[in-house]
């Protein structure tokens, strides 16, 4: 778990993932979206979140999107990767993979499928945070996840 202070501020858009008509990833179109956001002056990119189709993607596809985001950001702004998995163990594994490929941080979502009690949700976030040295952004979307992380 990272102990260093992170001061993310400004606009960090949740980037949509682009697909071809056969539902395969369109990495060129996704890259173009990201490059335009960078050109428009965003403060960072958040990829593989809800609008990034996280739960529809394989781990390999998520890592490809992260690589595209890193290229689009060009080291000028941080890239934050969404971690939304069905179990805490899967989330820990994805956090480690995101760290391995060089993201600047992760946006951790509550474990999927079942709503949890506040102490269970907190335990999930703590467990994922201890699996990596990356800073984490906590994702709170009560209507979708049935958990309020405030």
Model feature map: region roles:
Residues 2-148:
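Active-site beta->alpha loop and helix N-cap motifs at the rims of alpha/beta catalytic domains
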């Amino acid at each position: 778990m990272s102990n260093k202070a992170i001061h993310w501020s400004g606009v960090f858009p949740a980037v949509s993932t682009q697909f071809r008509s056969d539902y395969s990833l369109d990495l060129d179109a996704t890259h173009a979206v990201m490059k335009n956001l960078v050109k428009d002056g965003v403060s960072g990119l958040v990829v593989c979140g809800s609008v990034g189709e996280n739960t529809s993607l394989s781990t390999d596809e998520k890592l490809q999107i992260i690589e595209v985001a890193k290229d689009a950001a060009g080291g000028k702004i941080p890239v934050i990767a969404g971690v939304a998995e069905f179990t805490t163990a899967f989330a820990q594994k994805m956090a480690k993979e995101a760290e391995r490929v060089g993201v600047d941080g992760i946006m951790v979502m509550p474990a999927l499928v079942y709503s949890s009690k506040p102490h269970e949700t907190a335990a999930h976030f703590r467990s994922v945070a201890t699996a990596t040295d990356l800073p984490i952004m906590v994702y709170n979307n009560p209507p979708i996840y049935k958990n309020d992380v405030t």
